């Protein structure tokens, strides 16, 4: 059973956004302090999001509006992963029909990719994103292109996107609808594929042991970390509830109620001058945060061994 020293020793924190740090326009309690604590300890965080409906600049604007100072370089999106994949597969010159927002199309065009809205053009591939501007015409065009044999890619497999009033269909739900109509399934680019994790580690020079991924979804966030070979933290502030763990083939390394619980653990740490890792005693308050959130992940030995 993992001990809490592993959580405190991390240097690269890969963070989901929706359901992990905020919900719509509400920043979760402790989120801003958690990010500040990471940097004050000399750590690095990167935001990984499957949401292709907006560019990194809009996330920067949103987080600043919510009280978090950040930069475009702090983000890696499923659109970034899509561009990298197309280039790696020699598809950078292919003609794409994109079912996505104008923001997504603008990002792809700025990356030098060729796009068309004409289903009768010589389309090489259909790309499905989280399209908040989706129309029936786009769905019809997608079916026609898939029936013609166009290559088929999707930015993410998420079934739903959380909002303040509940959930709305995400890219995965639309892809399932297209499957029912055409029998075609896409090659999925974003989480749970490990590409964004590996890219973030490579850019920062971090090892797998130094890296942790935090997210609220088992089948995308946590599976992504597992596929990349890094520790994962499931937070119960978004889509996944603790009851969902029993029936899941994907299991996180740790389960916490929210990022505020991780903050409680970090706040107990004092770095020894000669150490990169943190091994300060954990208080009953911080221990309780983990125990309450994940009794089946809790080990009293992990605390006793640090006293």
Report the location of each language-model feature.
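Short, intrinsically disordered C-terminal tails of secreted or membrane-associated proteins
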Residues: 296-306
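Asp-based, Mg2+/Mn2+-dependent phosphohydrolase catalytic module
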Residues: 1-15, 23-41, 52-76, 83-274, ...
């Amino acid at each position: 059973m993992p001990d809490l020293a592993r959580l405190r020793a991390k240097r690269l924190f890969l963070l989901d956004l929706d359901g992990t740090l905020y919900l719509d326009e509400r920043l979760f309690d402790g989120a801003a302090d958690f990010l500040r604590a990471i940097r004050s300890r000399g750590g690095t965080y990167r935001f990984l999001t499957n949401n292709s409906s907006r560019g990194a600049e809009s996330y920067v604007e949103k987080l600043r509006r919510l009280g978090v100072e950040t930069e475009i370089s702090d983000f890696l999106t499923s659109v970034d992963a899509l561009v990298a994949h197309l280039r790696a597969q020699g598809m950078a010159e292919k003609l794409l029909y994109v079912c996505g927002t104008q923001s997504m199309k603008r990002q792809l065009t700025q990356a030098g990719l060729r796009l068309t809205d004409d289903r009768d053009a010589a389309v090489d591939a259909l790309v499905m994103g989280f399209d908040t501007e989706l129309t029936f015409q786009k769905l019809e065009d997608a079916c026609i292109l898939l029936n013609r044999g166009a290559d088929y890619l999707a930015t993410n497999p998420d079934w739903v996107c959380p909002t303040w009033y509940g959930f709305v269909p995400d890219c995965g739900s639309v892809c399932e609808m297209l499957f029912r109509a055409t029998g075609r399934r896409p090659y999925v680019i974003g989480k749970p594929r490990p590409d964004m994790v590996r890219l973030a580690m490579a850019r920062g020079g971090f090892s797998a042991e130094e890296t942790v991924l935090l997210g609220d979804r088992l089948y995308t966030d946590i599976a992504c970390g597992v596929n990349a070979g890094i520790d994962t933290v499931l937070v119960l502030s978004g889509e996944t509830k603790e009851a969902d763990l029993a029936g899941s083939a994907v299991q996180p390394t740790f389960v916490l109620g929210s990022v505020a619980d991780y903050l409680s653990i970090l706040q107990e740490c004092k770095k020894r001058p000669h150490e990169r890792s943190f091994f300060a005693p954990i208080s009953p308050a911080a221990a309780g945060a983990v125990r309450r959130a994940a009794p089946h992940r809790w080990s009293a030995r992990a605390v006793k061994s640090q006293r």
